[in-house]
Amino acid sequence: MRKKLLSIVAVWLVALSASGQDIYLPVLQQIEQNSTTLNALKEQLEAQKIGNKTGLTPANPEVEFGYLWGSPAVNGNRKDVSLQQTFDFPTAYVHRGKLSDLQNNSAAFQYASERMDLMLSAKKVCIELVYYNALRQIYARQLGNAAKIASAQEKMNKTGEINRLEYNKAMINYADMENEVRRIDIERQRLQAELTALNGGQQITFDVSEYQSSVLPENFDTWFAEAEAGMPALQYLRSEIEVSKRKIQLSRADALPKLSLGYMGEFVPGQDFQGVTFGISIPLWENKNRIKQAKAEARASESMAEDAKVKYYNHLNNLFSQVKQLQVSVRGYADALKKNANEELLNKAYSLGEISLMDYLHEMEYYYIAYDKLLQTERDLELALAELTAFRL
């Protein structure tokens, strides 16, 4: 038993100094493939892209036909035919096409941000499951020990070898371990149900019970440069700045005169009149304040992007410091448990009658509380690391 504990602690220590295989990847890959949420977001993205490519062409041509009865009838009837096509100023089509491409980029970044949030949620569920899976192993072992003690105490109680107090303590300890295992199983089932929901309703299991943490570089600013470049939410805000700047150029082009070109014909008995028509609009008030609005939106986009960057920097800087402190705590707990693995010694001392049942249960409780704290600290470390490295999902 002691060797098993030491090997587990050794794995935790190695995980702090080296990055192992990604234990979450298989589950995350399944969720990315089966998630109904992601499928809906993909369809929404395609709809947005199609919408952004709509309205890039000139307006529909207009055709008119007129038939006028003459009076008196001897004058005959008149027929009018006209065909007209209206055009925006040519540069407007150039800017609309480029704006469409930029809007599609923004839509892709928005999808990537929502995808990252979903994958991060799934990873956090897995991290919680690792904790409860490990805790389940600990308390299953405790339950086994409690069952053996309760059975032995019951036999001794029947023969009068022990007092009622020790017997009651053994029974209560056994019931307590049963309830604790049941509580842990309920939490594991809840988390497994969350994973199944994220996986589009398809059953998925995650039985890993050991963490394999990554190692962060010492310098936060160097690391943040990578995180900032890869964070979809910030990429989206930066792309929105480009969109707003392109809208300024488009609003200027829309403020220029519109052109129209067409054909017109008038036909009366004995006389036909036909030819081309050309028109130009006078841009007086239709697009008034559009350029001002576009500039204001551009300034707002830049302010939002800068604000988001500052918040993101401070949030990650806090997480970065938290991770460093948690790593120290994990090493402290792991070293203490490695040097003071008392479970085997306590079992031996109790079986030889060197310590009472009360002392044995008290010492075991103290020992497993420390073990649980190690697991909790390891879980908190992994959750913080998950947020720090979410842009890599």
Task: Identify the residue ranges that each predicted region occupies.
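Periplasmic alpha-helical coiled-coil/stalk elements that build and connect Gram-negative outer-membrane
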Residues: 3, 22, 117-230, 326
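Acidic, low-complexity, intrinsically disordered peripheral segments
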Residues: 7, 28, 375-393
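Bacterial Sec-pathway N-terminal export signals of envelope proteins
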Residues: 20-62, 67, 87, 95, ...
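Amphipathic alpha-helical coiled-coil segments
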Residues: 40-52, 114, 118-141, 148, ...
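Solvent-exposed loop/turn segments connecting transmembrane beta-strands
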Residues: 44, 68-78, 240, 264-275
